[in-house]
Amino acid sequence: MQKRRNIIRGLRWAKALQDKPRFISSPRIKGIQRAGLIYENRIANYIKALYGDKVIHGQWYEYEDRRGLGWCQPDILILPDKSRDFLLVIECKLKATRKAWVQLNYLYRPVLEKIYPQVDLRMVQVVKNLDKNLKLDLIDTLDDVFCQEKKFEYSTLFLRNLT
């Protein structure tokens, strides 16, 4: 199996998969990774309760770029509807990180632009803990993410508690 890549170069095609690729195992996750997955699932359930069937959690995608085949799985997508003309891509992290920006913009963005060519994308890192050393464009509430007047391509939402 080839090494994971976070940057796509020369994307040729991309498609959504019905299931997780067979060769990707489901190991028993422990520690900080488990805590991160629990946080992601909480965020996904919260967003599904608000936005229903427009929410896609854990969708796998296959793509081919100059380096060959690759696979990726954005945490959460919220599809456009009558009141919202953009696709929202959410990456959940326990702690704010620059890695999320790279993942969202150089891995997920090219794949999703290929699959949804007529739709604008908004990328959001949802975090449980902030890093005071990172300069972040913060959004105050989940409602601000969906506000048509606030134009942005990438931002961070601090969601410690879901109440």
Stretch-by-stretch model annotation:
Residues 1-51:
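Interdomain/boundary linker segments immediately adjacent to catalytic/signaling cores
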Residues 2-14, 119-163:
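Domain-level recognition of nuclease-like catalytic cores that cleave nucleotide substrates
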Residues 26-31, 69, 91-92:
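Short coil/turn segments at secondary-structure junctions
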Residues 31-32, 46-84:
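Active-site metal-binding core of divalent-cation-utilizing nuclease and nuclease-like domains
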Residues 35-40, 68-69, 99-104:
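Phosphate/oxyanion-binding active-site loops and adjacent basic polyanion-contact surfaces
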Residues 40-43, 47, 55, 75-78, ...:
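Hydrophobic beta-strand residues in large extracellular and virion-surface proteins
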Residues 88, 93-102, 106-144:
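Nucleic-acid nuclease catalytic cores
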